[in-house]
């Protein structure tokens, strides 16, 4: 399977920070990292900072404050949101004949309800680490000039993480 998009974290870092067994094939993980980057990480960083980080990763030049940001803050949020997105698909298998529960050699597969509970726990972990990321960026915005930079039509950096039933925070552009 050809992968053309860069991942913000490596397989080694994902496995070091996640509860995922080393037995799970990387092909089941990486697409969820891409989705996590699109759904949570890019909106938290803003498009300009996200593109700067991804460009540095592609070039192998990620260093200094940017490396600290990725390794200490972005990586943890990415890991937990990736698990949140992946768990439902790691429990099932989509085949030509339909959707089936996976079988395992060394245990009993969990129910979809149990998988959902575990996934929700992963989402809560991801939200915690995403808030830490946002707080860090707000406190250190002078270290990341791209964080406050938004060109017309770009995704601005979000300063809001948790979503509840009623948000009374004012919105300013």
Predicted feature locations:
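Conserved short "hinge" loops at termini or chain/domain junctions
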Residues: 1-75, 89-97, 101-121, 125, ...
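Catalytic-loop motifs flanking and including active-site residues across diverse enzymes
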Residues: 78
């Amino acid at each position: 399977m050809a992968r053309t998009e860069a991942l913000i974290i490596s397989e080694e870092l994902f496995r070091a920070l996640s509860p995922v067994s080393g037995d799970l094939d990387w092909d089941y993980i990486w697409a969820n990292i891409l989705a996590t980057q699109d759904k949570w990480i890019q909106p938290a960083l803003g498009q300009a900072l996200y593109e700067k980080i991804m460009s540095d990763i592609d070039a192998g030049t990620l260093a200094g404050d940017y490396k600290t940001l990725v390794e200490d803050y972005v990586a943890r949020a990415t890991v937990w949101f990736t698990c949140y997105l992946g768990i439902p698909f790691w429990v099932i298998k989509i085949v030509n004949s339909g959707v089936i529960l996976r079988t395992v050699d060394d245990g009993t597969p969990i129910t979809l309800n149990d998988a959902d509970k575990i996934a929700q726990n992963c989402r809560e972990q991801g939200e915690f680490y995403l808030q830490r990321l946002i707080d860090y960026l707000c406190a250190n915005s002078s270290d990341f000039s791209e964080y406050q930079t938004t060109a017309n039509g770009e995704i601005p950096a979000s300063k809001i993480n948790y979503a509840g039933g009623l948000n009374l925070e004012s919105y300013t552009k």
